[in-house]
Amino acid sequence: MQLNSTEISDLIKQRIEQFEVVSESRNEGTIVAVSDGIIRIHGLADVMQGEMIELPGNRFAIALNLERDSVGAVVMGPYADLAEGVKVKTTGRILEVPVGRGLLGRVVNTLGEPIDGKGPIDNDGYSPIEVIAPGVIERQSVDQPVQTGYKAVDAMIPIGRGQRELIIGDRQTGKTAMAIDAIINQKNSGIKCVYVAIGQKASTIANVVRKLEEHGALANTIVVVATASEAAALQYLAPYSGCSMGEYFRDRGEDSLIVYDDLSKQAVAYRQISLLLKRPPGREAYPGDVFYLHSRLLERASRVNAIYVEKFTKGAVTGKTGSLTALPIIETQAGDVSAFVPTNVISITDGQIFLETDLFNSGLRPAVNPGISVSRVGGAAQTKIIKKLSGGIRTALAQYRELAAFSQFASDLDDATRAQLEHGVRVTELMKQKQYAPMSVAAQAVSIFSAEKGYLKSVELNKVGNFEAALLSFMNSEHAPLMKLINDTGDYSADIEAELKAGLDKFVATQTW
């Protein structure tokens, strides 16, 4: 075979003409240590706090410690195959998650990836998980209610749209049950819900999703999951991820509700990460910024004014306020609300619902302790009729608790004290409510009206529940227009009071309970 020098020359010229100069600039580093989901990287420059670092196999880590000669990052996912010498590179991006209406009815992980087997998500865009909370001028006062469907909560500890109300108690006291019932009660209210499960068993979360679906509330809800078996980084970031998904609706002039179940486990995950990053431990071995961990999250729950919404949507939505209501859950140990994380979250939130083990075990469910449960801003948002009628409920229960303790040592009681005890024990019985059975405003109003106006005096204690069920059935059939009026307006007038009284008198005369 003879080589033609002209052909070779032409071929070389052609290659030279077609040659393109491409320069790629990459900020690349090398892993120098791997341990328990934490990697230490040498050689990276210009890294941002919280920046995503790309690892081999389409995985990412988040830069948390920026030191003089190395970067400490936490791996989001499996890390067993990472070793010293592996090359990694910066992305120049902060972690973002998909947001939009396409996520409603779906179960996603911390990164917004679907894990329910229903195919890809049709999201409207992406939002950073760390967002600065709206400022003072951008906010509006809380004056619209979020109905949980629980008489004990809506009457004594009302929650408003844009409020942060802590649900606190020992394990197995009904904290998750209360939050799930609050979500179920929103299915026809227009409030979009986000349920964030942190560090829970996968079987427990599957049961929650099934219950939401059974009661028709899943279509209105986004479920964000970071199970107990997932990396600590994913458990730490899950609440921020869910919050961004809820803010999507708030910023567009809609109302949303988010449940963090629970922030104790998030704090434990963050403590684990911080100790592995060799940050100095403080009280209970938590890092120094554990307060900021929760405050920057819960401050994002707010009610924003119409100007903020109009500016955010560039004029597409006008005259509408938006809200994100938060129900964080904290698990206490042996009822100790003075521990580090519980006191932090109590000081950040606008009130707390304290659930007690003793009350739960005695059959009072929801096991709300009205003595130390409080809502600091919800009173302004309470429905008119419930606010008007429920004034005596908290007083009756407080007096009953005091007298019940006193009566154990007193041999004989006067008639007034005995009447107060009788009334208190019946109101306590009336506050009991089954799970997955949230009540409408009208049903709550009728129930509380019967207690306030003395209709329970003649009812035997063990028949209070039957009396209430029969009364509500009677009112819904015989006084349907009145019940609809109360549900629609929430007003309380002399005419409504007269009709309620007439209905109750008529029902009591039937003796059908």
Swiss-Prot record:
PANTHER family for this protein? ATP SYNTHASE SUBUNIT ALPHA, MITOCHONDRIAL (PTHR48082:SF2)
Q: Which GO terms describe its molecular function?
A: ADP binding; ATP binding; proton-transporting ATP synthase activity, rotational mechanism
| The protein, known as | ATP synthase subunit alpha
Q: What does this protein do?
A: Produces ATP from ADP in the presence of a proton gradient across the membrane. The alpha chain is a regulatory subunit.
Q: Can you state which reaction this protein catalyses?
A: ATP + H2O + 4 H(+)(in) = ADP + phosphate + 5 H(+)(out)
Its cellular-component GO annotations read: plasma membrane; proton-transporting ATP synthase complex
Mind telling me which residues the site (Required for activity) is annotated on? S373
Q: Where in the cell is it found?
A: Cell inner membrane
- Which residues are ATP-binding? G169, D170, R171, Q172, T173, G174, K175, T176
The UniProt gene name for this protein comes to atpA
What does the record note on quaternary structure?
F-type ATPases have 2 components, CF(1) - the catalytic core - and CF(0) - the membrane proton channel. CF(1) has five subunits: alpha(3), beta(3), gamma(1), delta(1), epsilon(1). CF(0) has three main subunits: a(1), b(2) and c(9-12). The alpha and beta chains form an alternating ring which encloses part of the gamma chain. CF(1) is attached to CF(0) by a central stalk formed by the gamma and epsilon chains, while a peripheral stalk is formed by the delta and b chains.
Q: Which organism is it from?
A: Shewanella baltica (strain OS155 / ATCC BAA-1091)
